[in-house]
Swiss-Prot record:
This is Probable tRNA sulfurtransferase. HAMAP family: ThiI. Catalyzes the ATP-dependent transfer of a sulfur to tRNA to produce 4-thiouridine in position 8 of tRNAs, which functions as a near-UV photosensor. Also catalyzes the transfer of sulfur to the sulfur carrier protein ThiS, forming ThiS-thiocarboxylate. This is a step in the synthesis of thiazole, in the thiamine biosynthesis pathway. The sulfur is donated as persulfide by IscS. The keyword Protease does not apply. It comes from the Bacteria.
Length: 400
């Protein structure tokens, strides 16, 4: 015998009423995305859950991939047998042998297929008695707090037997809450913020500003690698590279150093706003944390936010750096984030940045930056990639 299925249970999406079908389809699509490395594995919707058929594939890497998918409340490794009592008994016995340290157990039969002739209570008794006899005193029944709960789920297509429940990523399926344009810097914070948004159902498109030759190809590859890490949580991610060298050198030349960071951030947000509107995206996000640096004070955020009417989401706003670092390590982005390749935010970094920049002063300095021309040129030079878990390729259609 071999565990040949994984039963996936829904999380919050089960509470979505009339939209449940839509959420289920999104979750199924996201599950199929993370299972692409396993060509024999199939996933399908059936009887109020998603069933993953392993088809002789090792269950451990498949279960590990499923554990990352938002929208999954829990999952169980399952053995499928025919709707025959003897097969159920032997199946339950096999599942218990996978828990050698267990001292107590119970059988919980669910006869969803009402044409099966043995009712649930009788199944509990018949299967439990068979297991007790096989273990000859090594196991005891505990119906209240068993070490192992053997669930026997009788369906028309067959009986699924499980003996353990594993926690999923919970949250909402990626894509169920709409799209967000996320500013991905290449540091520790922004990938964590993107992951948090994905957990609330947001489909993120990434926007990265790069400044060659001050930032090199390794810095660009680092951002691609971070984006690829995030695809394991649900789906392919579109990544946009905005050429920012000309804007950045122009700001450095024309703007007082105390306002350089503010004007640079305002230009980034201007460009992000235009890209988001072009693509029908309803919010912009980033990895800012309140008070972490000069550009992340409330006064700075207020002055920078002037460049858009779209919501600017900041999932890390109240998180400290240690918490963010621990989060990055948990989701697997930390080691890539700390690679020593500069991004555009570290170039020409002034030491006297204003922590309370004024809107009127910012607008005054922007008169010398040729804002409209520079924004148009940057957007015209965007390079867009579709990043998957396996490879990266240019988008087929011209996006801008």
């Amino acid at each position: 015998m071999k565990m040949d299925h994984i039963l996936v249970r829904y999380g919050e999406l089960a509470l979505k009423g009339k939209n449940r079908g839509h959420f289920e389809k999104l979750l199924l699509a996201n599950i199929r995305h993370v299972l692409k490395p396993f060509p024999k594995v199939q996933a399908k919707r059936t009887f109020g859950r998603i069933v993953v058929e392993l088809n002789s594939t090792d269950h451990e890497p498949v279960a590990a991939a499923l554990a990352n998918v938002f929208g999954i409340q829990s999952y169980s490794l399952a053995l499928r047998v025919e709707n025959e009592l003897e097969a159920m008994q032997k199946g339950a016995l096999f599942m218990l042998t996978q828990h050698p340290d267990a001292k107590t157990f119970k059988v919980s039969a669910r006869r969803a297929y009402k044409l099966f002739p043995i009712d649930s209570q009788s199944l509990n008794h018949k299967i439990g008695s068979y297991v007790l006899k096989a273990f000859t005193g090594e196991l005891a029944v505990d119906v209240h707090h068993p070490d192992v709960n053997v669930v026997v789920d009788v369906r028309e297509s067959g009986t699924y037997i499980t003996a353990g429940v594993y926690a999923g990523a919970k949250g909402l399926p990626v894509g169920s809450s709409g799209k967000v344009l996320h500013l991905l810097s290449g540091g520790i914070d922004s990938p964590v913020a993107a992951h948090m948004l994905m957990g609330r159902g947001a489909e993120v498109e990434m926007l990265h500003f790069h400044s060659p030759p001050y930032t090199n190809e390794r810095a660009k590859q680092k951002v691609i690698d971070l984006t690829r890490e995030l695809t394991k949580f649900g789906r392919t991610i579109t990544l946009h590279f905005v050429p920012f060298t000309d804007i950045q050198t122009h700001i450095h030349k024309e703007v007082p150093s105390s306002y350089e960071m503010t004007i640079m951030r305002r230009m980034m947000l201007r460009i992000a706003d235009r890209i988001a509107r072009e693509r029908g995206i309803l919010a912009i996000s980033n990895g800012e944390s309140l008070g972490q640096v000069a550009s992340q004070t409330l006064a700075s955020m207020n002055t920078i936010n002037e460049m858009t009417n779209l919501p600017v989401l900041r999932p890390l706003l109240a998180m400290d750096k240690e918490t963010t670092i621990a989060y990055a390590k948990r989701i697997g982005t930390y080691e890539t984030s700390i690679l020593p390749y500069e991004d555009c935010c570290t170039i020409f970094l002034p030491t006297d940045s204003k922590t309370k920049p004024k809107r009127d002063r910012s607008a005054h300095f922007e008169q010398y930056v040729q804002v409209e021309e520079k924004c148009r040129e940057a957007i015209a030079g965007i390079e867009s990639l579709e990043v998957t878990g396996a490879h990266t390729s240019p988008t087929l259609d011209q996006l801008f």
